Regions:
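Metal-associated gating/positioning segment near the N- to mid-region
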Residues: 62-124
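N-terminal metal-binding scaffold of metallo-dependent hydrolase/deaminase domains
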Residues: 1-48
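Conserved small/polar residues in nucleotide/adenosyl-binding loops
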Residues: 191-192
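Distinct, well-ordered alpha-helical segments
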Residues: 113-117, 143-151
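Active-site-adjacent beta->alpha loops and helix N-cap segments on the catalytic face
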Residues: 111-115, 167-179
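Short amphipathic alpha-helices and their capping/turn segments at secondary-structure boundaries
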Residues: 59-60, 90, 173-187
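Active-site metal-binding motif and surrounding structural segment of the metallo-beta-lactamase
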Residues: 43-64
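Divalent metal-dependent hydrolysis catalytic cores, especially in the metallo-beta-lactamase
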Residues: 87-111, 128-140, 154-168, 184-188
Length: 192
C-alpha cells in the first residue's frame, strides 16, 4: 500500500489549528511537516503521485481530522432492522467522518447476557464498516429490576445503560454504580 500525503490541510496540533502536511502509512500518521505546496492549483479531488511514489492530495481550505466518535447511536440490529441496521448505520457514519460508534442496547435480544450480546457482536464483525462498540444493558431486559451480569459483559462493552428507560430504584442504581466502578466501566444515564 502506498503512503498518502495530505498537503496544505488545517490540522489541530499542539493546541491550535495550523496548516500542515500529513503523511499516512498503513493507516497511521507517520510525519507532520510545514506545507509544501503553498499556492498549489492541485484539486483536492484529483490526487497525484509525487517523486516518492506517495499519493498526494491538496487539502487547501479543508480541515483534517483523524475521525469522529459518536457515543450514542441506534443501529437497531438485532431485532429492529426495519429501522436501521449495523451496516447501514455504520456506512452513514463513515460517510460523515465517524470512525467509532457506540450502540445503545435497546435491541431484541437486549444485550444483558453474553449470549445475547454475542448476537449483536457477530453482526458487527460481519457488517460494520467502522468500529462499532456496543453498550451493555444495566438491567435485564432494560426493565430496571435485576442487574445484568456486569462482570460477564464488561470485557465486551464500552459502558452500560438502560437507554431511554432508566433505573428508577435508588438501591439498584447504587449497586450498578459500585459494580461499574469496580470494573472500570461507565454508566450512561442521560438521554437527550
Amino acid at each position: 500500500m502506498r503512503k498518502l500525503k495530505l498537503v496544505n490541510g488545517t490540522v489541530f496540533y499542539h493546541g491550535r489549528f495550523q496548516n500542515l502536511d500529513l503523511t499516512i502509512d498503513k493507516g497511521r500518521i507517520v510525519r507532520l511537516d510545514l506545507p509544501s505546496l503553498s499556492g498549489s492549483s492541485v484539486s483536492p479531488i484529483s490526487p497525484f503521485s509525487n517523486e516518492n511514489n506517495e499519493i498526494v492530495m491538496d487539502c487547501s481550505h479543508l480541515h483534517i481530522f483523524p475521525g469522529f466518535v459518536d457515543l450514542h447511536v441506534h443501529f437497531r440490529e438485532p431485532g429492529f432492522s426495519y429501522k436501521e441496521t449495523i451496516e447501514t448505520g455504520s456506512r452513514a457514519a463513515a460517510h460523515g467522518g465517524y470512525t467509532v460508534c457506540c450502540t445503545m442496547p435497546n435491541l431484541k435480544p437486549v444485550p444483558d447476557t453474553l449470549e445475547n450480546l454475542e448476537v449483536q457482536r457477530a453482526i458487527i464483525r460481519d457488517k460494520a464498516v467502522v468500529h462499532v462498540l456496543p453498550y451493555g444493558a444495566i438491567t435485564c431486559g432494560e426493565k430496571g429490576a435485576k442487574l445484568a451480569n456486569f462482570e460477564e459483559l464488561a470485557p465486551y462493552v464500552v459502558a452500560f445503560t438502560d437507554d431511554g428507560v432508566g433505573v428508577a430504584d435508588e438501591g439498584r442504581m447504587r449497586e450498578a454504580m459500585v459494580k461499574a466502578k469496580a470494573l472500570g466501566k461507565t454508566l450512561s444515564l442521560i438521554h437527550i
